[in-house]
């Protein structure tokens, strides 16, 4: 999930367009770093 973080935009550092990325992994992707890295590389290459 990627979203604009309103706390960063409206107060604090006041950085418009600041993004927050949340991720969760389960099963093989939680336990095998190479498998997780491979899948994330495919996603990032959209």
UniProtKB/Swiss-Prot annotation:
Is Nucleotide-binding set as a keyword in this record? yes
List the source organism: Bacillus pumilus
Q: Does the keyword Magnesium apply?
A: no
- Give the catalytic activity: GTP + H2O = 7,8-dihydroneopterin 3'-triphosphate + formate + H(+)
State the EC number(s). 3.5.4.16
The lineage's top-level taxon is Bacteria
Protein name according to UniProt: GTP cyclohydrolase 1
Please provide the record's keywords in A-Z order. Answer: GTP-binding, Hydrolase, Metal-binding, Nucleotide-binding, One-carbon metabolism, Zinc
């Amino acid at each position: 999930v990627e979203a604009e973080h309103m706390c960063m935009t409206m107060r604090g550092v006041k950085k418009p367009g600041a993004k927050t990325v949340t991720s969760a992994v389960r099963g093989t992707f939680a336990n095998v770093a190479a498998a997780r890295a491979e899948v994330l590389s495919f996603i990032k290459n959209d």
